[in-house]
């Protein structure tokens, strides 16, 4: 009592404490970073290696495997996957959450160094690594276009200057430049001219390499001067290479220009990039795993004026895609929802109290509690994101509850004629324990969330802590500021009922009287209520099993990603045409604002597209509806498919897939994997629960298999190395020399001129110079026949892997899709040599599904323990927790009604309901126990009186929580996909709980009281009088 009096009788100190909390919160708010969601990115490092011209199988066995064995020894690696394609290997390392990305990078570099001696010779550079997840959508895409500059020159400027500058910005993890390649001098050989002159391809290569050298020449000095020796030992342009003498034929010089076309071109001509309908160079910027997306984008935008100043006038630099506007719009929507919730909650209080002064008290308590929370969020390193702001929106109904309970009890004493300060002290003392019980038991709900591991635990931690801090501050405010304001602002009055006979007061009296009448009937028919209670428990179990489930609500971020997959034997020219066709289809859609794309590189039959949709206010359809519409349009394109998916703020795993969810097949036998993957993919494609089924296993590429006759080769004086060198020189875009420039290094690339390699007959024109100097045609010692070969080889760990990706059709949940896949795998009878498991987001969903019930049970158990300690009773916590089944039924029925699957957001709503609905029972039980102890009432009389006395605060707190969550249900615009499931769950649970617990709680109270008396009689011993 003295504790409460300290704040009631010292108003200045109390006001200053509240002001200090508010000021700290305002300062914290201004310093908090902004993000779409809490930081949940796994630390990911990508290792890249290249060996131009090497087949995917060669890259997998000679490059990927040695690196994997070395990298696999690093501590904290959660998953390691690799993909090897023509001349390229990429290994993705995903680390545990607690692994520091910089420390992991040092270990990766050490592992690369350890594997260096096992890697094949001829690699143009050592393997490199980047601290970025290649499967993440870029946070920003910049495009460079020009009417006068070539694509190679644009690419050179972008990679040499722009990418380097952008990479230095805080938060940037990787700047991937696409659309072309670095400039190079390309030597296109004429096989017939070489044969006529008797010049081998190796001779050409060696001549070029010998003519372009960069070696130190030293210096000459005398007693006075010193001269640095410099020679013209370097050739830098095509014009300088053309007159190069490569051979003498009967004393006549054979120059390079006589047997080849030499041009200033690019290293890899099989690359193309576009923005809308124009050729472009793309700078795809990804953030570091731990970086804040908004701060990183702001840093890039701040750098743009400097970048534009250094760009020549002939180049146009534009932002093709920016993730930040939709994130900011989403947060603005949440902030508006928060403001509406606060207004609605205060309106509810005013309607019940019908007094401006009385309403002002909780109207002050709410902002003080919410604003003060920002300070704690800043100290915890949190951000302003959708989940933390949603926590504050929901907290609006919670933080006002404590103030309402205290205010309502003080007002009751004032209405009885007690003096204000005395009423404030007496009223606070009476409900102080109740308020503490309500708040501590509510915070206890979130303790299991704080201990939850993995991605869900990281994702929900900020929500739980933010809400717990708001409740804690609210508890302090309700026991200090609220009674002080009541004591000094409210006035006592003589007992009268007139105010209750007007407007809302009259309705409340009528409701209370009707409730009293119905409660009497219920207390006389307790068995029927017991049956209803047990029915709600059973209905909970059935609804939870039956309701569709998913991991996280599908968001409309305004950005789509598209993966193009064409026939495996397609040429680059045809693939470029497919890219243009698909971009036109997308560009013509009225909901699309911008589209960029690229193709080429090591995977000729694939391409990527990034689509920016118009803002939500300018289009009627959701992102998924637009995808459904575009899926129909692009299905008419022959020889290729475009797989579209909406970019999400959460994406798990490092696999680059053409759909949102993945199912991975593993086997130690590559043959078994290649046999069963098509069967499984075909069966999954037929499932109505899946859409856009595709696979990264591409083992049907066109190959020309050359078979050497080794005996003939030996007789002709030719070895296998010379024959393989011939093929590499002719068709491998072989980088044979380096040109050193001040800003970068460029390559001299040699191959047969594309004019002479249009079909397989080009092999007939190839020849090898044997040991006797004679030109021996390739057809003399080799035969060739067409065959199929893989375009890529994939590993997970050290096992061969194939990932089947899929999207969800409209109206299908992830749980329905995973159940259908598991059922199909069982029906197919897949052998044990092929193992299947979900990966990425689908894998996390499976893990979350297994822990959801455990989490709910743990929350209930924690609340029981806290209540048991507070009440020093095993029984009363059970009475309070009996409110939960009705809330669960209401929440699940509401989700079914709105066709919303049970997601991680809905789980948060269930956890919140555990904390909300028990408040009604706490208020009933507290007053009933007090009435039994001090008033000498029977349990039936005590619980009946408690229900009637607490009817008004129960209605106030429930309606405050309901109206606080209602804006989440009704909200639209950006980010509404996250807010609505939470609001639906809470509103549905509150409505059902309010209808049932006003009757079931008294019945359960009496049941346990009778049970207690029965056990106490059994355990009591007769007293013997002496």
UniProtKB/Swiss-Prot annotation:
Membrane topology: Multi-pass membrane protein
Pfam families the UniProt entry points to: ACR_tran
Keywords: Cell inner membrane, Cell membrane, Membrane, Transmembrane, Transmembrane helix, Transport
Spans through the membrane: 15-35, 333-353, 360-380, 387-407, 431-451, 463-483, 528-548, 853-873, 897-917, 953-973, 984-1004
Molecular function terms, GO-annotated: xenobiotic transmembrane transporter activity
Cellular compartments per GO CC: plasma membrane
Subcellular location: Cell inner membrane
SUPFAM superfamilies: Multidrug efflux transporter AcrB pore domain, PN1, PN2, PC1 and PC2 subdomains, Multidrug efflux transporter AcrB TolC docking domain, DN and DC subdomains, Multidrug efflux transporter AcrB transmembrane domain
InterPro entries recorded: AcrB_DN_DC_subdom (IPR027463), Acrflvin-R (IPR001036), Multidrug-R_MdtC (IPR023931)
This protein's record includes keyword Cell inner membrane: yes
Sequence similarity: Belongs to the resistance-nodulation-cell division (RND) (TC 2.A.6) family. MdtC subfamily.
PANTHER family, alphabetized: MULTIDRUG RESISTANCE PROTEIN MDTC, PTHR32063
NCBIfam families linked to this entry: PRK10614.1, RND_permease_2
Subunit structure, interactors included: Part of a tripartite efflux system composed of MdtA, MdtB and MdtC. MdtC forms a heteromultimer with MdtB.
Name of the protein this chain belongs to: Multidrug resistance protein MdtC
